Amino acid sequence: DLLLAAGAIVMGKTATAELAYLGPPKTTNPHDHSRTPGGSSSGSAAAVASFMAPLSIGSQTGGSVIRPASYCGVVGYKPTYGLISRNGVLKTSEKLDHIGLFGKTVEDVALLAKVLIKKDKFDTATVYYSADGILEETKKGPLFEPKFIFYKTDHWKNIEKKSREAFEYFIKSFKKNIEIFDTPSYFKDIHKYHQIIHETDLANNFGLYYKKYKKKLSKPMQDAIVKGNKHSAKEYAEAIDFMKRSYESYEEVFEDYHGVLSPSSPGVAPKSLKSTGSAEFNKVWSYLGTPCISLPLLQGESKMPLGVQLIGAKYDDHRFLGVANWLEKECNN
């Protein structure tokens, strides 16, 4: 309704992974039809990459916006948790589900955010946050050259050779702006707690599907629901409590830096349609609820697109998009 009121023309619906989880749809990668477009927002990213639509909407619980954006070579933006209503979207996890936006440029997604960021009584997770001036601030960018932290994380070893070389060249090119930091120790706990919340919520939300249509569900979805039913209330409560404590530790970096950089994915889109790829570089930020964006700045194997992920502080999306726009323009100049 917000988009229609703003004058948008709705082109149609796009394909998503099974119940917005892991089961891949029929969508292929526009750059190479033998490769996955990523997921779960597969069609949303592919539609923008193939010029079927200038903008699109998806969702992210683990890495379902950032990863497809990286694989398809478009901009994918996941705002701070609670800025965009999830009313009408299939619920997989109350605490982890985010709405995400796709476009060709940072200014594209800022335009979409300007319309969609709004408090909604039908989604109690939404907060009052004014989107006034978000497009203007995005265009204006930071007042001075930003400084970044680059987290390689423990997953750096999983990045394919060509992609690792591309990231190392990127870091070298921005050496005056980037400092490489050791991965915070609590990141390992976040991956564990993200899994507990995600699986428990999948079991709660799709338990009826499992009972009635088990044979129609993919093996990964069946396994997630079974695991989710085994997590205790104590484990779930610990996972929720750790969200606040870990974010307080993370937030300290913004006293001296404008953002955190990391790979958007462990490489280019895998040459298979049986998987939507790995979200290992994304789950931390979905858990913390921070704004993050994938910028199509690099190329990996076979000249396939490769995204650089920028992460910001919660409820600082105006400034965050301005910094992202600066980085995009610096790389394109």
Predicted regions and their residues:
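Short helix-loop capping/hinge segments that flank enzyme active sites or metal/cofactor-binding pockets
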Residues: 142-151, 193-247, 251, 296-307
